[in-house]
Amino acid sequence: DAATQKHITDSAKLKTELAQILKDILNDGSDSKLQVYGLPAVIMVIGVNGVGKTTTIGKIANMYKKQGKNVVIAAADTFRAAAIEQLEVWSERAGVKLIKQQEGADPAAVIYDSINACKGKYVDVLLCDTAGRLHNKKNLMEELKKIYRILDRELPRGSKEILLVLDATTGQNAVQQAKEFKEAADITGIVLTKLDGTAKGGIVFSIKNEY
């Protein structure tokens, strides 16, 4: 309808118009930028194993580091083998501090230690990794709720973003993942990964419409 009203017939202009319409649907008139204020601002990253949470955290850490911000990463996925080691690599690349414990430690304890490491140190952003064991759904969801309660209690004034990471190639499975994680966390944004292939991430419109 918009194309007809504007008398758009050129395919390139039509593509641009369509892209803007889709962007408007996702933005919904709100600011799509991450809200980062308070010392520290918290960005909690959630999602099932294998979707790219660790890589996402590394990229966000690198982005804020390049902006001159002081960043700390909390390695709270203590269950997946090599999760902590992968974050060590990313934190070294970005030049940011990593707070960790041994594999199998209480994730909430890692978050608590990370908060204490930030207090009084002028840390701008605390990035929190989390586990993604959806096959153990009940324990995972309770764990996420516990982590958020600690963040809310210890850092009441700072901004808190909860980003759900979804693999763009998974289609309808991503909708189900969004539903299940929304039961445990107040998701503020979605990160789509693996868009370098044929997947274009159209599933976000279904998620936006439903949730």
Predicted features by range, described:
Residues 8, 12, 81, 138, ...:
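Non-catalytic, surface-exposed connector residues within folded enzymatic/regulatory domains
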Residues 1-76, 83-119, 123-128:
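Primarily NTPase-proximal linker/entry elements flanking Walker-type ATP/GTP-binding cores
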Residues 53, 77, 129, 167, ...:
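Acidic active-site catalytic centers that drive phospho-/nucleotidyl reactions
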Residues 106-121, 135-211:
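Conserved catalytic-core segment of NTP-binding enzymes
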